[in-house]
Structures are given as structure tokens and as C-alpha cells.
Amino acid sequence: MTRRILIMGLPGSGKTFLARELCDQLMSRGMSVTHLNADAIREQFNDWDFSAAGRLRQAQRMRDLADSATADLVIADFVAPLPEHRVIFDPDYLIHVNTIDQGRYADTNQIFQAPACCDFVVTTQDADHWARQLINCLFNK
């Protein structure tokens, strides 16, 4: 069964850098990994709607794509600004990239709610370091 990691946080916090580094490190250890980047998915579906309905649709789309993956692990990086977006995606592991106080977009800053509970909090923009920490914490128990 494919496990899902959601790497979430404000735009510009370093989610994609961390997701890519984590994918690389896990693949070098022999795991099959699928990376879902929200911006790439929006581009693929030509859906740049950031309304409440558009954000919900994107969360469901990310979930559907994760559900159809055949890899050992799906790593998704997207803002997921509200708790309901995270519930829709239903991650096995929730990683909050909490490296900035304000993102690039005022509308996202206004609605963003940090998770009350998560599996791991990233506090600096050092993808290599945090990818190693995540692997140790999540996979070497």
C-alpha cells in the first residue's frame, strides 16, 4: 500500500526543495517514490483557480493522483492552507514547513492555518539536512 507524505506550508517556505531532496534521498535507498508538486499539477490541468472551491478541487485532485500511484511512497508538496485540505488529502505523515511568517500571496496569508498537530516541523530552509532528519524520524524507527 502506498503511503502518503504531505509537505505543506506557505508559498516560498521551501516545500518543493524539501520534497525533491527527500525524493532523491529515498530513491537512493531503493524506495520507489512519486512526487506530486501542486504547481505542476495545476499547470497540467490548466486550473489556476484559487477560490475556496478551486482550493478544495486541488486538494481532491492531489488525493486522487496519490491514490492512483503505484510507488511505495507519494510525496506531495502543496500549501494546503486549511485543515479541510489536509483532511481531504489524508496523509500518513504531515510535514509543516514553517520557515517564513508571510508567503508571497496576501490571500493565502489571510486564510492559512498552521496545523494544530503534525508529524514533523521544518524550521529552516536546509533541504538536505531536513530530508535526512525526516528519513531518520519517519523511516528508521
Walk through the language-model features, giving the residues of each.
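Hydrophobic anchor at the beta1->P-loop junction of P-loop NTPases
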Residues: I7
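Conserved lysine of the Walker
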Residues: K15
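Walker A (P-loop) ATP-phosphate-binding motif of ABC ATPase nucleotide-binding domains
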Residues: R4
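The conserved Walker
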Residues: P11
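Small-molecule kinase domains that catalyze NTP-dependent phosphoryl transfer to phosphate-bearing small molecules
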Residues: I88, V97-K141
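Glycine-rich phosphate-binding loop used to anchor ATP phosphates in small-molecule kinases
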Residues: W48, A53-Y105
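Conserved substrate/cofactor phosphate-moiety recognition/catalytic segment
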Residues: A19-D64
